[in-house]
Amino acid sequence: MILRKGRAAAMPFIMLATVIDMMSIGLIIPVLPALVGEFTGSQADQAFWYGVMTFAFGLANFLASPILGALSDAHGRRPVLLLGFCGMAVSFLATVVATALWMLVAVRLVSGAMQANMSVGNAYVADITPPDGRAKRFGMLGAMFGLGFILGPVVGGLLGAIDLRLPFLAAGSLALLNLLYGYFVLPESLPAERRRAFHWKAANPVSSLRGLAQLKGARPLVAVIACTGLAQFVLYTCWVLYTTFKFGWGPLENGWSLAAVGIVSVIVQGLLLGRLLRWFSPRRLAVLGLVSSTLAYAMWGAASQGWMMFAVIFANLLGATVAASVHSIISSAADARSQGQALGAVGGLNSLMAVLAPAIGAPLLAAVSHLPPGDWRIGAPFYFCAVLQAAALVLAVGQFRRERARRGAAGGRNSK
């Protein structure tokens, strides 16, 4: 049982951890390409090695998410969370003193693996929250995700202007502070009687995804997560290049637009989600969010003026509710002893989408880059994302209708 003091500290710790996790990623976005450039002799080599590091981070995150989730089911959430922050601190601080490309690749592998511990943070929230309150709590985490996404690139750009390695020093220091805070304050959320033995089969990313798909009613939702995650990461891959080519935006405009995405996430998931859940169930909210996101991606692709990109960002409020709603449904489908494995598999699936997105989005944009900026086909990556969101919508609606039909049939049998 979590002590009152520990219970009060638990959710703020996880929220702070999420902010730091996103800030640590955002801090290095403006400076990592330039840091890689210090070790390469040409722009082509710089682009290649930056791609290698992006792939290494995503691959390590994909492989580590189910392992850390299964470890947390066996040994508790607290030690795995603290291990993750320790590893993150080491990887960031090691970057400060890196003197060769292979060292940068190595620390990105470690960083990707250790940042997979945020799936354990989701499991921690599921442990301490009743099922009917999880969507709101996951929404709060989403708001912290957005806040970190606002602060990270801004702070990273300012620090990087002083020294390219200074953002890594700042990120490592934040991770160390969170490690110390968690060590002295954070209680364990998973009692011994709810733990289960660690098995490598459960920690295998492919097996964990298969196990996730076997949860009652979850298989279509796995496809929903894959589609929405891939669309999101394709957007992140193409946004800057797309807006630069189509509207002539520079770093300032792109920085403000990405900050706007984070602001919407904070407003919706931190302030509005709780109110929305009073009116709509997580399933209904997920459907409304997918409708909104489908339209938003299509409008981003068709936008003819830069201000339209901002207008759609702020119009797509419901789109920011999808992840929290679906995570809540997945969490409710898993039993109390499998939260870490289930949510670790969700994290691993998102990491896999992050690996695939550059290989899909960049070639799509390159294929239409010869067209004049006013040509509607320039928005091809965003139209692709709209199709992904529409597919997710069809899958979700079909699954929720089947659930209602089963409940109706069960109610009919019970009334006889």
Q: What label would you give each PLM region?
A:
Residues M1-A8, P187-V224, K246, R413-K416:
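Juxtamembrane intracellular "pre-TM" segments in multi-pass secondary transporters
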Residues V31-A47, T237-N254:
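Short amphipathic helix-loop junctions that connect adjacent transmembrane helices
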Residues F62-L101:
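Conserved MFS/SLC helix-loop-helix module at the cytosolic interface between two early adjacent transmembrane helices
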Residues A64-G76, V268-P282:
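Helix-to-loop junctions at the C-terminal end of transmembrane segments
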Residues G76, V97-W102, M114, G248, ...:
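Helix-breaking motifs and short loop linkers at transmembrane-helix boundaries and internal kinks
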Residues V107-G146:
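Cytoplasmic helix-loop-helix junction between adjacent transmembrane helices
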Residues G160-S173, L365-Q389:
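A membrane-interface helix-boundary motif in multi-pass transporters
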Residues R283-V326:
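C-terminal transmembrane helical hairpin of 12-TM major facilitator-type secondary transporters
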